[in-house]
Amino acid sequence: YRKLPEAEANAPFIKDQVIVNQDDEVLGFSPRFLLAAAALNIFDIVQLIHRNGGLAIASHIDRESFSLFSQLGFIPPGLALDALEVTPLMSLAHARRVFVSDDSLPLVRFSDSHRPEEIGRAWTEFRLAAKTWNELRRAMKGSGGRKVYRR
């Protein structure tokens, strides 16, 4: 939040930026423009994700906007991503040819749902020993018999 520009969200095309709690109760509205780019480079972002126990997955890489490839045009060498997410609009085989020519990064699919009817339109199956973040991380790396299933 501190790395966002101090611009207000008062443009007519900006919808309410709701602040909610864990019970989905509205606590208020953010006056700051949350769609703006943060003053962080991509290496710092991935490092923060990993430091906080998360998985760094470049989302909807096949989209013409709001994706790693639309912004940079490539994966920077040394960027420690855990996976690349492809929308249902592109086949995984085609995405493999276009975005990453080897198996160094797994390709995954998620719903990226913005409306209830879109939930479940895409998914990824994993072989895990337990339902934990560490197991997901191991599956992304293909270690210890864990894996990401390509469909």
Please provide the spans of the model-predicted regions.
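Phosphate-interacting basic helix/loop segments used at nucleotide- and nucleic-acid interfaces
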Residues: 38-49
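Charged catalytic cores and adjacent phosphate/nucleic-acid-binding surfaces used
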Residues: 4, 16-20, 33-34, 47, ...
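N-terminal processing/targeting junctions
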Residues: 7-11, 52, 112
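Divalent metal-dependent hydrolysis catalytic cores, especially in the metallo-beta-lactamase
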Residues: 28, 54-57
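A structural motif
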Residues: 7-25
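Surface-exposed cleft-lining segments at the edges of enzyme active sites
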Residues: 24-37
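N-terminal-biased segments
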Residues: 1-8, 57
